[in-house]
Regions:
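Glycine-rich, basic loop-to-helix element that forms the pyrophosphate-binding segment
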Residues: 65-82, 99
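Cell-envelope/extracellular polymer assembly enzymes that use nucleotide-activated donors
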Residues: 2-4, 32
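A conserved acidic beta->alpha catalytic loop
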Residues: 22, 29, 37-46, 68, ...
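Short, well-formed alpha-helical segments that are part of the catalytic scaffolds
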Residues: 12-25
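Hydrophobic/aromatic residue at the end of a short beta strand that borders the catalytic acidic motif
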Residues: 90, 95-97
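Short, flexible, basic/aromatic active-site loop/helix in glycosyltransferases
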Residues: 133-169
Length: 169
């Protein structure tokens, strides 16, 4: 199975750059990366152009005019141009674990949505990560605000995972 990775963003080119670096470092690359841009300026476009020129990722830029906060419309526009049957949605400040896409594809099942949690970095640790282009973080990192979400364990994942079949959408 292949997937589209949709990344929402708005005027945080330095964060988007770090996210795209983490995407390039995946053990399994997404078939396409679509940047769902809610009206960012030229600095975001420059970051996207730089990654497009690397040719490691197949990146499309789905941009809409800045008319206020319209993230849902931006995401929907990106969804409409995706070419894969499996979609992964993330925010433009989510640095991915190296197995993020691989794990999504491994656990994908028709009729189910996979939802996870993220680890939050302190403002100081975020600045440091952007400056040093750090995409790997340790469970013991002092800059984490919620350490438990940074644990990576297939055993624990299976132990705490739950399927909710009663939800309708």
């Amino acid at each position: 199975m292949k997937c589209s990775l949709i990344i929402t963003t708005y005027n945080r080119p330095e964060a988007l750059e770090l996210v795209l670096l983490s995407v390039e470092r995946q053990t399994v690359l997404p078939e396409e990366v679509i940047i769902a841009d809610d009206g960012s300026d030229d600095k975001t476009q420059a970051v996207i152009n730089n990654f497009q020129s690397n040719k490691i990722l197949n990146i499309q830029h789905s941009w809409q005019e800045d008319k206020g906060f319209r993230a849902a419309k931006s995401r929907n526009k990106a969804l409409s141009i995706s070419t894969q049957e499996y979609i992964v949605l993330i925010d433009g400040d989510m640095v991915l674990h190296t197995h993020f896409i691989e794990d999504h594809l491994k656990h994908a099942q028709k009729g189910f949505v996979i939802q996870g949690k993220r680890s939050l970095l302190t403002k100081k640790r975020t600045s440091s990560a952007i400056k040093n282009q750090t995409t790997l973080f340790s469970f013991l990192d002092n800059g984490l605000q919620n350490h438990k979400n940074s644990l990576y364990s297939n055993f624990l994942s299976r132990l705490f995972a739950s399927k909710k079949t009663h939800l309708k959408g």
